[in-house]
Design a protein with these regions (language model features):
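OB-fold (S1/OB) nucleic-acid-binding surfaces
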Residues: 147-172
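Structural detector for short beta-strands of small beta-barrel domains
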Residues: 133-148
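Hydrophobic core residues within well-ordered beta-strands of beta-rich domains
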Residues: 134-136, 154, 187
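Short, surface-exposed ligand-recognition loops at beta-strand->loop->(often short) alpha-helix junctions
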Residues: 224-226
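Sliding clamp-binding short linear motifs
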Residues: 1-129, 192-194, 199, 203-213, ...
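Short nucleic-acid-contacting surface segments enriched for D/E, G, S/T with interspersed K/R
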Residues: 173-189
Length: 226
């Protein structure tokens, strides 16, 4: 469609030129969250709020196409978007992850990196198996809960923008820090790195798990670990 009739000029133009039987509301929302319309309009929140209106107007236009009515001169590009506050960058990144499964325009770890690197110099991409524990930090990107003979454990994937690693949190520790383990949240982990025969990469077995508040209030104590 774009090659045949030129670039899309607005969300409403996009909706009016597509077969809405093939492109549904969820597809519109995913494209917006991923930034596909950024060159047309930079406010993704307004675009997302206007999806229903765009689809409704497009359906009306399709229904009256060719009839001698006002819809024959259907000017989709002139319909205003619904006003909505622009997303803060953290919100935008979270929405990208909903659509794509990963952060695209930036990485949320950057909001903490300067402070975290003062006492957690270890980047996830640089970790190697060793006996002494590491202190690591990253954003929780994936959480998997497993039942074992020793109770429930969590396998969480931490991501610092440069690398990723799976962290195994045993039942005892998990019980203590369960409320801290949430997707898209920063976590600091003290643990031992070992080779994971199943994935071929490394994984870390958690000894202790900390949230940002604990780290900020006890920086000096963590310098000796890192």
């Amino acid at each position: 469609e774009r090659k045949s009739n030129g670039p899309f000029t607005s969300l409403f133009d996009f909706a009016s030129r597509l077969d809405l039987r093939k492109v549904n509301r969820k597809a519109f929302e995913s494209l917006i969250r991923a930034g596909a319309f950024d060159q047309i309009h930079s406010n993704r929140a307004s675009l997302l709020a206007s999806v229903n209106l765009a689809i409704t107007k497009a359906e009306q236009g399709h229904a009256h196409q060719g009839q001698n009515t006002l819809f024959e001169e259907f000017e989709t590009s002139e319909i205003p978007l619904i006003d909505s506050d622009i997303w803060e960058e953290r919100k935008q990144l979270a929405e990208e992850k909903i659509a794509l499964g990963f952060y695209f325009s930036n990485h949320p770890f950057k909001f903490y990196e300067k402070m975290i690197r003062e006492f957690v110099p270890n980047r996830l991409s640089e970790l190697k198996p060793r006996e002494s524990p590491y202190l690591i930090a990253g954003i929780i990107s994936v959480i998997r809960m497993r039942m074992t003979s020793r109770g429930k454990i969590a396998i969480i994937t931490l991501d610092d923008g440069a690398g990723r690693i799976d962290v195994v949190v045993g039942n005892k520790i998990l019980t203590e820090v369960y409320d801290l383990i949430k997707e898209d949240k920063l976590l600091v982990v003290e643990g031992r790195v070992s080779h994971d025969d199943f994935t071929g990469g490394n994984r870390i077995s958690a000894i202790k798990v900390y949230d940002l508040l604990t780290i900020q209030s006890s920086k000096a104590a963590f310098l000796s670990i890192s």
